């Protein structure tokens, strides 16, 4: 038996301990007490737990077997003993010793238990197919006596037969457990066998020597695992693993076991991964069976002879994931706390690689030695992935699921997204604020709101009254009054302090007021503090006695009501000299050259000589903030050297070049001055032909000499659309007044342009604003004429009669008909001409045009008309009435507010600068062209190329001329007397704005005169003449934007007449008007005429009218709603696009 090598225990195989590590003294001690220890392990598992093999447990930890739960190795050793003791009969002699040892150790078991725990039902290390049989054997083992223990060992023998590794023989009396390595591969061990060896993993220190004496076979002391690294509180020397390992050694005889047997036993273990549902380490995949190659590799490694260092190297490879076993199984569950490698799970067991400790999240830990409470949930298969194991089994503050080791069988799966292992449903149970509950609408009532009325209270109150039933419904609220009140409050100066108040006491009051306002209005800027030296000293009382500084009079410390507006930033001076200096500097700045260059408001208010009333200056906000004393302002200005005062002392102006600043055309309205009103009558009373053309000739000089003139017109343009519906001119006369003397019309114009308070009659917001002068009456016809041009869809004949047509003179024409210059083909030239025509029209409507027309020798007028002719009443109404200038008195009336003055200014600008009906329409609609140039084709068409059938593409193209128009201001005058040309009497003089047209020898004519001339040319020279074609072209373009019924009827009548005799230019121009005019403004009667004329034209074999109808139906937005004649529909279906009209039909080609 000596040649037999003893079989190592499974704990030694797993831990890889060298047998030479044990001391000789321990070997002798194990040999003496081996009988007692073996009996203790066989009879009952509680007894074995009372005396656990500490040394063996410590050796397991050193070898890295921290993953195996407690009790698994012991259960295997029992199976091994059963298999070995079947042929051996020496085991019976050891029974009495085992019985005695069992009786002695039982009382020690009770104090070892730290915490109560349920008995485990499943052995996580070995789950075999013979699970039921092994469970029954384990139950019998607990109840039977010593003979029953022997029978249990014998019945367990067939289980050992599965082991493929040979079992080394040893003395049975010394080593009862050499069979442990063989059952490692077995799977027949029941789960219940796990309960007993793991019930008490810790034993008292007193039992340590008893277990140590039992192990005789251990010749060396096993190195212990530093469990302080795992649990932090168990020392290697006192760990119960030593007891467990020493107790385990009693199953092995005291004989020596070679390392070769250790490796054979290790290789014989079944490493198949049959566990299902076990948590994985990092792989996350299901466990798979190991291949036969892995088993062969393990067997080859077990059969090799190696030293203890070689075995340690093998286990180090296993830890570092370098062994073949670990390489083939990457989905193993590993304990991160104890660095365990071996595990049993789901009926299989095997080695597992070591995984780096990643916070212990995915790696279950075996039960610690300090925790005696075990259950079947201690196996790694019951630990959820997202739960970190608690290394300290005694952590009582930990969750119940993780307390006592890895007891996670009752732990509920926590939500990953909720802290402390909570679940999603727990959030709803927790109280939340109202703004966090988004699942429903939260009524957020105002806590200060009164309680809601009950049904009885609502019934008692009854329904709400109607607005009509409420008495005193008209509150007569005046918005302008409110604004003026705020205006006066804003610019109102703070009150002076009482002169009898001591400066020191006044400063105290100001500090108190500042503190008071700061507490209620933290955003208010601090009130400027007044220094004592700025305040006037106390005045002398009656009798010449000065009041003492600290008199006994009570001081009123009440804080007055703080105004809405902030107080002025600068303190108000208390002396008149300082105040005059401030006022003088402020007014001098108004009249400085720097300010006048940009202050158009002052320049419009100036008279011809540059004067402005002092009352106007006194009403400015900055001046009013300094003082409202009119006499003080006059006194301050008398000492000024930078402003000049008028002889009467009521007006001031700039001292240097005062006449260059006024903007004369806009001087009128509420703040008009007596300068223009006093000089204007003298100009209008002049008679003679020289005075007639003076206003017209003086206008270009004014525009060229004054650099501010263009700026004035830009100001007027910015107010387009604001003067809609207002009367525009006082020079318009009715048919009854056409032949009245021109002096009467002059007087009306004079009264209309220079009346002081004319603006009050044209602004509803300031009705009754104080204008006392009589407003001149406007002629009725002018109102009707202009309103007809604005409000009606059609332009009246009275507007057409004011048209001024500009066409090239006949001298520019040649036989080829190409009269246009090179500049006319450029877009820049056309744009400049367009701008010049608009400016010319504005000036025609702005500057009054007075012309002396010879009247009849005999005429009768009334007395009123005679007085108006003389201009007596107008002179009184205008020049004799001085402007309302307040007198220098103490009771100065409050000037008009800024709102009123702005409204007056807008009204004055819109009235004094009238706009033509065309400009008013353009302010509401899009702009219309006033110049119609000739757009010649870029290159002549080839004779063989397809083209449209129109007169321009014929062999003899018609003569076309550009044409322009502007709207004049006066109606067409009657025929001029003998000796005066019609054009010179009705057309205004040439203007610089149309200098480009004058360079190209354009001639301007009144529309009626030009039309008659064209009709005469048509009658005398034939239907196809240049003048008539120009008239057709003008009608075609002008009627698209400005439709006039009479003009259209005449256009259509003459075009159809020319078409009957073969002249096509007029009918083609008519078709162009139909197509583009209906697109801009659809008129049903015009559309009917369009289809009728096109039908007639198509029946004659022409296609131009059909092409324009086709183009209109394609561009029109309402084409689908229009009804087309059946004949035209059939003809239109022959063409798909406008390009198809270039190709003539086959019938036409033949």
From Swiss-Prot:
<feature type="compositionally biased region" description="Polar residues">
    <location>
        <begin position="403"/>
        <end position="412"/>
    </location>
</feature>
<dbReference type="GO" id="GO:0048477">
    <property type="term" value="P:oogenesis"/>
</dbReference>
<dbReference type="GO" id="GO:0045727">
    <property type="term" value="P:positive regulation of translation"/>
</dbReference>
<comment type="function">
    <text>RNA-binding protein that promotes oogenesis by repressing fem-3 expression during germline development. Binds poly-U and poly-G stretches of RNA in vitro. Regulates target RNAs expression either by regulating their stability or translation.</text>
</comment>
<dbReference type="GO" id="GO:0008266">
    <property type="term" value="F:poly(U) RNA binding"/>
</dbReference>
<dbReference type="GO" id="GO:0010494">
    <property type="term" value="C:cytoplasmic stress granule"/>
</dbReference>
<feature type="compositionally biased region" description="Basic and acidic residues">
    <location>
        <begin position="415"/>
        <end position="430"/>
    </location>
</feature>
<feature type="compositionally biased region" description="Basic and acidic residues">
    <location>
        <begin position="870"/>
        <end position="880"/>
    </location>
</feature>
<feature type="compositionally biased region" description="Basic and acidic residues">
    <location>
        <begin position="286"/>
        <end position="303"/>
    </location>
</feature>
<feature type="compositionally biased region" description="Low complexity">
    <location>
        <begin position="202"/>
        <end position="219"/>
    </location>
</feature>
<keyword id="KW-0221">Differentiation</keyword>
<dbReference type="Pfam" id="PF21071">
    <property type="entry name" value="LARP1_HEAT"/>
</dbReference>
<dbReference type="InterPro" id="IPR036388">
    <property type="entry name" value="WH-like_DNA-bd_sf"/>
</dbReference>
<keyword id="KW-0896">Oogenesis</keyword>
<dbReference type="GO" id="GO:0048255">
    <property type="term" value="P:mRNA stabilization"/>
</dbReference>
<dbReference type="InterPro" id="IPR036390">
    <property type="entry name" value="WH_DNA-bd_sf"/>
</dbReference>
<feature type="compositionally biased region" description="Low complexity">
    <location>
        <begin position="740"/>
        <end position="755"/>
    </location>
</feature>
<feature type="region of interest" description="Disordered">
    <location>
        <begin position="851"/>
        <end position="958"/>
    </location>
</feature>
<feature type="compositionally biased region" description="Polar residues">
    <location>
        <begin position="675"/>
        <end position="686"/>
    </location>
</feature>
<feature type="compositionally biased region" description="Basic and acidic residues">
    <location>
        <begin position="86"/>
        <end position="105"/>
    </location>
</feature>
<dbReference type="InterPro" id="IPR045180">
    <property type="entry name" value="La_dom_prot"/>
</dbReference>
<dbReference type="GO" id="GO:0000339">
    <property type="term" value="F:RNA cap binding"/>
</dbReference>
<feature type="compositionally biased region" description="Basic and acidic residues">
    <location>
        <begin position="184"/>
        <end position="198"/>
    </location>
</feature>
<dbReference type="GO" id="GO:0000932">
    <property type="term" value="C:P-body"/>
</dbReference>
<feature type="region of interest" description="Disordered">
    <location>
        <begin position="161"/>
        <end position="461"/>
    </location>
</feature>
<feature type="compositionally biased region" description="Polar residues">
    <location>
        <begin position="856"/>
        <end position="865"/>
    </location>
</feature>
<feature type="compositionally biased region" description="Polar residues">
    <location>
        <begin position="370"/>
        <end position="380"/>
    </location>
</feature>
<feature type="region of interest" description="Disordered">
    <location>
        <begin position="1"/>
        <end position="105"/>
    </location>
</feature>
<dbReference type="InterPro" id="IPR006607">
    <property type="entry name" value="DM15"/>
</dbReference>
<dbReference type="GO" id="GO:0005829">
    <property type="term" value="C:cytosol"/>
</dbReference>
<feature type="compositionally biased region" description="Polar residues">
    <location>
        <begin position="336"/>
        <end position="346"/>
    </location>
</feature>
<dbReference type="GO" id="GO:0003723">
    <property type="term" value="F:RNA binding"/>
</dbReference>
<feature type="compositionally biased region" description="Basic and acidic residues">
    <location>
        <begin position="919"/>
        <end position="928"/>
    </location>
</feature>
<feature type="compositionally biased region" description="Low complexity">
    <location>
        <begin position="25"/>
        <end position="40"/>
    </location>
</feature>
<keyword id="KW-0694">RNA-binding</keyword>
<feature type="compositionally biased region" description="Low complexity">
    <location>
        <begin position="697"/>
        <end position="710"/>
    </location>
</feature>
<dbReference type="Pfam" id="PF05383">
    <property type="entry name" value="La"/>
</dbReference>
<feature type="compositionally biased region" description="Basic and acidic residues">
    <location>
        <begin position="55"/>
        <end position="74"/>
    </location>
</feature>
<dbReference type="GO" id="GO:0034046">
    <property type="term" value="F:poly(G) binding"/>
</dbReference>
<feature type="compositionally biased region" description="Low complexity">
    <location>
        <begin position="235"/>
        <end position="249"/>
    </location>
</feature>
<feature type="region of interest" description="Interaction with mRNA">
    <location>
        <begin position="990"/>
        <end position="1140"/>
    </location>
</feature>
<dbReference type="InterPro" id="IPR006630">
    <property type="entry name" value="La_HTH"/>
</dbReference>
